[in-house]
């Protein structure tokens, strides 16, 4: 988890929780293998209804733990730097979870959007159809690749 302002990293920390925990919760809750659970997570996300609702209810406790960590980082940053966080940018594979932007925005009462690093870097038109889904998972890698060393 990181806080940036003016294009500079101001605060960062690590969490042990990730989208893999959401997948494992589905696998354990439904008694299915992890591959099938990952498929259900990607296809249904937090938007499931009817019989699909169970998938989102299995993930929410783990997602709420991740958001609790993010809330702790937000509060700590705002207290120490006396600056308000204005929006949340979701990165990593979990940022592609259907409905996660809306859920995070509602939980934090802040705009939440998926990282889209390809808007800031040049790329071949050939990969344009893939940048929407690959941007968030690759955001950290792309950022590190662009970092200049002294």
Model-derived features: where do they sit?
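Hydrophobic/aromatic-enriched cytosolic interaction surfaces used to assemble or bind macromolecules
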Residues: 1-150
